[in-house]
Amino acid sequence: MKQFMDKDFLLSTPTAQHLFHDYAAKMPILDYHCHINPREIAEDRKFENITQVWLGGDHYKWRQMRTNGVDEKYITGDASDREKFQKWAETLEMAIGNPLYHWSHLELQRYFGYNGILNGDTAEEVWNLCNAKLQEDSMSVRNLIKQSNVTLICTTDDPVDSLEWHQVLKDDKTFDVQVLPAWRPDKAMNIEKPEYLDYLETLSNVSGIKVNSFASLIDALKNRMDFFASMGCSVSDHALEYVMYKPYTEEEIEAIFAKRFSGSAITTEEMNKFKTAFMVSVGKEYNKRNWVMQIHYGTIRDNNRFRYDQLGPDTGFDCINTYDCSAEMAQFLNALNATDELPKTIIYSLNPSVNAAIGTVIGCFQDSKAVGKIQQGSAWWFNDHKVGMTNQMTSLANLSLLGNFIGMLTDSRSFLSYTRHEYFRRIMCELIGGWVENGEYPADEKALKKIVEGISYNNAVRYFGFDL
């Protein structure tokens, strides 16, 4: 029997072990999509206890605690941090096969030097050990980032954000990890939302451009893109329930905008036309600026209305949308490509059943402007586990060039989650090592080194064009 999560965790063959320990493990981390707060980096926050780090905003964990019958008081409520940690430790015992089990223990091993097992019985021991360790200067946010060998972080930022904390970090020569904004304009696109008109007013004030038409909306966003670019931004991100494409005319879009601007509701057809026009318009701007466009789709959000009204969004009540919008996705990419204005694009679906569909769509729009110009993103959210990652990479290998894959991102709100890159790299090396051991790929050291180091880090550096 193998030891629990030892140095060869998830690595079952000599080749997999060699590829991980000699190549993948040594590579830095480029975290090109996450949800961490730049203010906490700028202020070099130190956490008082492990609950603040682990349970402060992690809806992955909250979801499983609810599944274990834990009262909301101990999840997002007013229970003490020690009580919340106890409930999480008791929940973790039941999480056999869940990536949270592995992530939690990787974090305990790497950051706290704890190689034991966290459960209800050991919770007090782990609580005391972690909290004592968190008081050390080495466990401040900046030092956690540095010891994780992170070279660059892209946060997630709304067009109206001031980016003041990015500026603080930009001016601080004592911290050499780049922390760059990433453009997330969902609120400017979501015309159906009740708060949309209030958002337009904020955008008008921040941009200095009165937004009272679709054309002026795009002008205001271009103004903010210029500001974001001045702060080092070269990455956008869009969260879509599905990728839509509905043919439209400029006159139709202006009429739809005017209808909504007057306070009237719009139809689903009108919403999809508007969002199509929005995505095409900003996509062209990304291409002009050589920005990368990320599209995350396949989510049905905030399904539990009772809890949403209590807790708000991003609290653990989202699910997979199984609608296959591959045809619309191809039409959308084609609309940009037809005028030679398709930017580098990364496509992530929360629905794992469309891995092959994405793999074939991206093959339709590659060109010589960039290696792997259109990428399938790493297994995301409900799929970033061993099976999900293995299936995504296997599908990508079957249909595209896995060697050009840009690899992993944390998509996290936690400063301990960089171990997810290690987790991914172990799974990737196990997959590739298995192919080599089975005679499906040669034991070509030079080629394997290039592929493993590329997927781990180098491909992303080249793809995004960051100065590293």
Swiss-Prot record:
Q: Which UniProt keywords apply?
A: Isomerase
For the keyword S-adenosyl-L-methionine, the answer is no
* Matches recorded under InterPro entries: Metal_Hydrolase (IPR032466), Uronate_isomerase (IPR003766)
Quote the catalytic activity from the record. Answer: D-glucuronate = D-fructuronate; aldehydo-D-galacturonate = keto-D-tagaturonate
> What SUPFAM superfamilies is this protein classified in?
Metallo-dependent hydrolases
- State the Gene Ontology terms under molecular function: glucuronate isomerase activity
One Gene Ontology term of the biological-process aspect is: D-galacturonate catabolic process
PANTHER family the UniProt entry points to: URONATE ISOMERASE (PTHR30068:SF4)
Q: Which family does it belong to?
A: Belongs to the metallo-dependent hydrolases superfamily. Uronate isomerase family.
Can you name this protein?
Answer: Uronate isomerase
Q: Which species does the entry assign this protein to?
A: Lachnospira eligens (strain ATCC 27750 / DSM 3376 / VPI C15-48 / C15-B4) (Eubacterium eligens)
Q: What does the organism's lineage look like at the top?
A: Bacteria, Bacillati, Bacillota, Clostridia, Lachnospirales
